[in-house]
């Protein structure tokens, strides 16, 4: 299995493997056209982020975002593209958290949805990926 296929598999586990998770009486599995579009956008981008996760350049941050953890591991000519991917991913993640809270009828839950997803992303990260833990970054 190549890195892109492995990354796509893990993205599906991370994004869609949230079955049974709930926030209070909320539904993290709720589906709206906006949520579906965000998930599709994130899944398509993940094939490009996968090698960055695998190399350790990008890690899963404790706040539910992705972060450029080690810029020196990305060739200078590719850093702009890496930063653009990270920015797009983080914009979609923020929109996803907001939309899930809104779709549950509780926009005030956005920060709780973010915290729940942040922990799930980290818990389900592939071995070898970097995750932010209390005290700093660690390799899973």
Regions found by a protein language model. Name each.
Residues 12-13, 140:
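Terminal, compositionally biased segments
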Residues 25-140:
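Anionic, Ser/Thr-rich low-complexity intrinsically disordered regions
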Residues 20-24:
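Sec/Tat signal peptide C-region and signal peptidase I cleavage site
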Residues 2-11:
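Bacterial N-terminal signal peptides that target proteins for export
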């Amino acid at each position: 299995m190549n890195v892109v296929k492995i990354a796509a598999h893990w993205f599906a586990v991370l994004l869609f493997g949230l079955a049974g998770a709930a926030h209070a009486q909320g539904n993290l599995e709720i589906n709206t056209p906006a949520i579906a579009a965000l998930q599709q956008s994130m899944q398509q981008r993940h094939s490009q982020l996968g090698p960055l996760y695998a190399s350790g350049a990008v890690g899963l941050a404790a706040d539910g975002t992705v972060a450029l953890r080690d810029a020196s591991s990305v060739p200078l000519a590719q850093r702009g593209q890496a930063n653009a991917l990270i920015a797009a991913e983080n914009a979609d993640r923020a929109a996803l958290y907001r939309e899930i809270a809104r779709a549950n009828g509780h926009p005030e839950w956005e920060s709780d949805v973010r915290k729940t997803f942040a922990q799930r992303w980290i818990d389900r990260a592939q071995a070898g990926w970097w995750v932010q833990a209390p005290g700093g970054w660690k390799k899973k």
